[in-house]
Swiss-Prot record:
SMART domains given in the database record: IG, IGv
Segments for region (Framework-1): 21-43
Gene that this polypeptide is encoded by: IGKV4-1
Region (Framework-3) residue spans: 83-114
GO annotation (BP), single: immune response
Subcellular location per the Swiss-Prot or TrEMBL entry: Secreted; Cell membrane
Source superkingdom: Eukaryota
Name of protein: Immunoglobulin kappa variable 4-1
Coiled coil: none
Biological role: V segment of the variable domain of immunoglobulins light chain that participates in the antigen recognition. Immunoglobulins, also known as antibodies, are membrane-bound or secreted glycoproteins produced by B lymphocytes. In the recognition phase of humoral immunity, the membrane-bound immunoglobulins serve as receptors which, upon binding of a specific antigen, trigger the clonal expansion and differentiation of B lymphocytes into immunoglobulins-secreting plasma cells.
SUPFAM superfamilies: Immunoglobulin
Signal peptide span: 1-20
GO cellular component: blood microparticle; extracellular region; immunoglobulin complex; plasma membrane
Record GO terms (molecular function): antigen binding
């Protein structure tokens, strides 16, 4: 029997200021992945979060486990926070981004959020 691990994906909306609302949409809503297999979570921004002056994408990924605050995994779309296992990786640019867990572990069961920080209230 294949052990299935449910990875719950959620949606984070970040309301911007002068640039107009930037809406972040994640897919899929939930994902069933076997332990040891790859999990892929997509995030789409309603407008580009790539800042042309420094060529950086203002996009972060967070992991939240029950009863705990969100933990930063990835910033600048693809830079892993210190201490985050290398099975977590981020990719994408402009409006389309992906978080990949290359080999899902039991401790990875959580809610995952993408967040733009290109514009803030």
């Amino acid at each position: 029997m294949v052990l299935q691990t449910q990875v719950f994906i959620s949606l984070l909306l970040w309301i911007s200021g002068a640039y107009g609302d930037i809406v972040m949409t994640q897919s899929p809503d939930s994902l069933a992945v076997s332990l040891g297999e790859r999990a892929t979570i997509n995030c789409k921004s309603s407008q580009s979060v790539l800042y042309s002056s420094n060529n950086k994408n203002y996009l972060a990924w967070y992991q939240q486990k029950p009863g705990q605050p969100p933990k930063l995994l990835i910033y600048w779309a693809s830079t892993r926070e210190s201490g985050v296992p290398d099975r977590f990786s981020g990719s994408g640019s402009g409006t389309d981004f992906t978080l990949t867990i290359s080999s899902l572990q039991a401790e990875d069961v959580a809610v995952y959020y993408c967040q733009q920080y290109y514009s803030t209230p």
